[in-house]
Amino acid sequence: EAIAASKYDRAVECIAAQDYKTAWELLDGMEYKDSGEKQKSIKPQYYRALLTKAAVGDTVFFGSYEQDNETSNGKEDIEWLVLAKENNRLLVVSQYGLDCQQYNTSETEVTWENCTLREWLNEDFFHAAFSDGEKAMIPTVTVSADKNPDCDTEPGESTQDKVFLLSVTEANRYFKNGEERVCGSTAYAKANGVYAANDYTTESGVAACWWW
């Protein structure tokens, strides 16, 4: 009891000093007073501290989304791969296929600008995956309407988004080959109908999914 009280008091001091990383680690797993609620309350600040120190190639956790398809135990933290860092802003991509959605719900010619997937990512997914504090950390950026280098298709107009898909150009830039681009899907995504190639798996043996 005395040890827990000492750790709790130190965590409170760290929060007051804005040392959220140390405070989080002190509160983690603690069952004392309101330690669980206090840890939850500093989650955005803790993530910000980790994100500030993240480098290209690191994995970071940010936001939460149903992944194990066991809704009774709540959402799981989302794991992201850092692709680029500039002026303390990170470009990240999910390590796993999180859901299965159509690019567009109707069979018509459409670009990223007008597809239903763009709306779903920036509305449904955005509000489901991130808390208010986390949303405040996600900037709106210009997504350039780059022409597909392999197909003569109309790219549409550039957009302003918070969540978006990598373009073919970006996928080729940040991942050198198809093997590096292999991505496994979550149990939740599989339950929602994601296509998984059982003959092509990730290093951990998870069936690869189509994501770009």
Predicted segments, located by residue:
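Collagenous Gly-X-Y triple-helix signature in extracellular proteins
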Residues: Y47-W212
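Residue-level detector of conserved, well-ordered beta-strand and adjacent loop positions
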Residues: V12, G36, L83
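Alpha-helix N-cap/N′ positions at the starts of helices
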Residues: A2-R10, Q18
